[in-house]
């Protein structure tokens, strides 16, 4: 649905709004990166299994493990230890995930008022975090041992934050400012 929405109406409206000469200049979504850090994975090798499976259910794609770049004694982490998992979504899976995120997960998120414009990085990319991964319907609350958060990065081809915000607003992203 989101892919058709982009192709049928968003491209035309953004082309008119920003006076692009060609539809290839219209910003588009490139990829969505989802990262889930796991605090106990450094000491317990089995601690990564549950978040790994949860991220697989949420994204619909097999995640990869992330490893520590250097040792930090305060966190009891050694270089090369597994510290989390991540997945990169593109094309149809990206649009399907964003649809579930906007219409299902964000309305179920506690104390969620909307996103801030300050969450853009200056290059047209948007990053935010979700405090509870149980906001997604794919996660069964009774089968998890711990509620975890996740970081979501949306990469666009927009040249500026203003263009990226208009693109995300067209996809019904909730901004409060």
From Swiss-Prot:
Q: Which Pfam families match?
A: Ribosomal_L5, Ribosomal_L5_C
Q: Which Gene3D superfamilies match?
A: 3.30.1440.10
Got any disulfides in this one, which pairs?
A: none
Q: Which GO terms describe its biological process?
A: translation
The alphabetical list of record keywords is:
Ribonucleoprotein, Ribosomal protein, RNA-binding, rRNA-binding, tRNA-binding
* Gene Ontology cellular component list: ribonucleoprotein complex; ribosome
| InterPro entries for this protein | Ribosomal_uL5, Ribosomal_uL5_bac-type, Ribosomal_uL5_C, Ribosomal_uL5_CS, Ribosomal_uL5_dom_sf, Ribosomal_uL5_N
Q: Does the entry feature the keyword Flavoprotein, yes or no? A: no
Coiled-coil stretches are none
Q: Which SUPFAM superfamilies match?
A: RL5-like
Q: Which GO terms describe its molecular function?
A: rRNA binding; structural constituent of ribosome; tRNA binding
- Asked if the record carries the keyword Ribosomal protein, the reply is yes
Q: Which family does it belong to?
A: Belongs to the universal ribosomal protein uL5 family.
Biological role stated in the UniProt entry:
This is one of the proteins that bind and probably mediate the attachment of the 5S RNA into the large ribosomal subunit, where it forms part of the central protuberance. In the 70S ribosome it contacts protein S13 of the 30S subunit (bridge B1b), connecting the 2 subunits; this bridge is implicated in subunit movement. Contacts the P site tRNA; the 5S rRNA and some of its associated proteins might help stabilize positioning of ribosome-bound tRNAs.
Record text on subunit structure and interactions: Part of the 50S ribosomal subunit; part of the 5S rRNA/L5/L18/L25 subcomplex. Contacts the 5S rRNA and the P site tRNA. Forms a bridge to the 30S subunit in the 70S ribosome.
Q: What is this protein called?
A: Large ribosomal subunit protein uL5
Q: Which organism encodes this protein?
A: Wolbachia sp. subsp. Brugia malayi (strain TRS)
Task: Print the organism lineage.
Answer: Bacteria, Pseudomonadati, Pseudomonadota, Alphaproteobacteria, Rickettsiales
Which gene specifies this protein's sequence? rplE
């Amino acid at each position: 649905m989101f892919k058709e929405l982009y192709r049928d109406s968003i491209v035309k409206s953004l082309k008119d709004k920003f006076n692009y000469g060609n539809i290839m200049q219209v910003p588009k979504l490139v990829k969505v990166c989802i990262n889930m850090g796991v605090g106990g994975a450094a000491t317990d090798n089995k601690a990564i299994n549950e978040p790994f499976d949860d991220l697989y259910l949420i994204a619909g794609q097999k995640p990869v493990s992330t490893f520590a770049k250097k040792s930090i004694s305060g966190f009891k982490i050694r270089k090369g230890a597994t510290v989390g998992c991540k997945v990169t979504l593109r094309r149809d899976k990206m649009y399907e995930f964003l649809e579930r995120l906007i219409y299902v997960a964000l309305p179920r998120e506690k104390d969620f008022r909307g996103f801030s414009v300050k969450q853009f990085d200056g290059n047209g990319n948007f990053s935010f975090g979700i405090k509870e991964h149980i906001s997604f319907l794919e996660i069964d609350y009774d089968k998890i041992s711990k509620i975890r958060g996740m970081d979501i990065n949306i990469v666009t081809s927009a040249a500026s934050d203003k263009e990226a915000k208009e693109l995300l607003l067209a996809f019904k992203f909730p901004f409060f400012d």
